[in-house]
Amino acid sequence: MADYFYVHKKILPDYLEKVLEAREMLDSREAATVTEATERVGISRNTYYRYKDYVFRAKDPARGQQAVLSLLLADLPGALSAVLTCVTDHRASVLTISQAIPLASHASVLMSLDLAGLKGDINTLLADLKSLPFVKNLQLAGLE
């Protein structure tokens, strides 16, 4: 890691961010070819090939790749299903799920999620989960 630096994009030339944009267009299939991607972002193919393997976006700490949620759900039909639907609507994937036997009309659920494909950010997902009528308590137990 001695060869790497974290620097603010403000001090870098604009074309480095355009290299990232071009690579993201190719990865998402928004552009079919390098030529198309570079033309759309306004850099030469030479610039793209020169820097594509050397410039990367820093991971946003608020956008981890895995999360562990602890939920307290009302013991009603469809409660867990509503939670899972909300999770998948945000394009998160359930890695593990553990539901305790309901006590006092509430069930405890521990869920780990893969957030690699998350639409939006973790805060939006948490807010949408909290807004579900079945969810009585929600805690983000961990984020990696």
Curated annotation (Swiss-Prot):
InterPro entries: ACT-like_dom_sf, ACT_dom, UPF0735_ACT_dom-cont. It comes from the Bacteria. SUPFAM superfamilies: ACT-like. Residues 68-143 form the ACT domain. Belongs to the UPF0735 family. This is UPF0735 ACT domain-containing protein Ldb1351. It comes from Lactobacillus delbrueckii subsp. bulgaricus (strain ATCC 11842 / DSM 20081 / BCRC 10696 / JCM 1002 / NBRC 13953 / NCIMB 11778 / NCTC 12712 / WDCM 00102 / Lb 14).
